[in-house]
């Protein structure tokens, strides 16, 4: 009887350790946001939070632009989508999620004009698998 109980306990612990990719992503996004956001990642860029939409398998990155970067014309001229696609292609930390075909969405807000969205794009498998 003792062996059966120990075996059942071991099996339940193994089952509890198995986490779906969606649950893992949701957990990691939440932990990152709670531990590291907001944070300056460059002189003119602050990461505010991350989010995850399980239905669309989309990881959302929310940023605020400050100073000289806080300008819609500057953002438009810099072609951020192209740079973000390259960043996703090169990001080894995203490999598991890229292999599963996840999407990566980026939203940049203005610091000086609250509520003004300066740029938004979603990078999907068609973009980063090229």
Where are these predicted regions, by residue range?
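Positively charged n-region of N-terminal signal peptides that target proteins for export
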Residues: 1-4
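Short, non-transmembrane amphipathic alpha-helical segments
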Residues: 30, 71-97
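Short edge beta-strands and adjacent turn/loop segments
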Residues: 41-67
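C-terminal motif of bacterial Sec signal peptides marking the signal peptidase cleavage site
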Residues: 13-16
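A short amphipathic beta-strand at an alpha->beta junction
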Residues: 88-117
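Bacterial signal peptide processing site
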Residues: 18-20
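Post-signal peptide N-terminal segment of mature Sec-exported envelope proteins
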Residues: 26-46
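Short, low-complexity, Pro/Ser/Thr/Gly-rich segments in the mature regions of secreted, periplasmic
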Residues: 117-130
């Amino acid at each position: 009887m003792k062996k059966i109980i120990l075996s059942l306990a071991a099996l339940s612990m193994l089952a509890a350790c198995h986490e779906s990719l969606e649950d893992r992503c949701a957990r990691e996004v939440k932990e990152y946001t709670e531990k590291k956001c907001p944070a300056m990642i460059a002189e003119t860029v602050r990461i505010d939070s991350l989010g995850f939409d399980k239905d669309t398998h989309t990881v959302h990155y929310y940023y605020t632009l400050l100073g000289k970067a806080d300008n819609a014309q500057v953002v438009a001229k810099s072609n951020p989508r192209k740079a973000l696609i390259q960043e996703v292609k090169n990001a080894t930390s995203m490999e598991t999620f890229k292999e599963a075909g996840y999407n990566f969405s980026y939203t940049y807000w203005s610091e000086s004009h609250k509520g003004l969205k300066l740029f938004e794009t979603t990078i999907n498998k068609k973009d980063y698998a090229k």
